[in-house]
Amino acid sequence: MKLVMLLVVVSAMLVLGGAQTASQFYCGDFLARTMSSLCWSDMQKRSGSQYAGYGWPWLPPFSSSRGKRGIVDECCYRPCTIDVLMSYCDN
C-alpha cells in the first residue's frame, strides 16, 4: 500500500512539474511572436524606419546556417522548450 501511494505521489509530481517545462511546436508567425516576446520585454508593432537595418538576432545569416541546426530545426520540426527558444536570444 505504501509503495502504491509513493508511486501516485511521484507520478503527480512529475506531471505537475513537467507542465512548466513542456515541449511545444513553434512555427511560422507563432515562432516569430514568441521570440519577440521572449527576447524583447515590450513587443511593439514594427514601423518602417524604426527597425530599418535591424535583423532578427536568433536567425543566423543564410550562408552560415547551411548544414547547421537552427531554431526551425529544433522547434518547428520537433517540439522544444522555452529554455531552448531563449538560447537564441541575443544577450
UniProtKB/Swiss-Prot annotation:
Protein name: Bombyxin C-1
Family of this protein: Belongs to the insulin family.
Additional comment: Silk worm has two kinds of PTTH: 4K-PTTH and 22K-PTTH; there are many forms of 4K-PTTH.
Disulfide topology: C27-C76, C39-C89, C75-C80
Assembly with partners or alone: Heterodimer of a B chain and an A chain linked by two disulfide bonds.
Propeptide, residue positions: 47-67
CDD domains in the record: IlGF_insulin_bombyxin_like (cd04366)
Keyword Secreted: yes
GO molecular function list: growth factor activity; hormone activity
Function: Brain peptide responsible for activation of prothoracic glands to produce ecdysone in insects.
Gene coding for it: BBXC1
Keyword Signal attributed: yes
GO CC terms in record: extracellular space
Species in which this protein is naturally found: Bombyx mori
Keywords: Cleavage on pair of basic residues, Disulfide bond, Hormone, Pyrrolidone carboxylic acid, Secreted, Signal
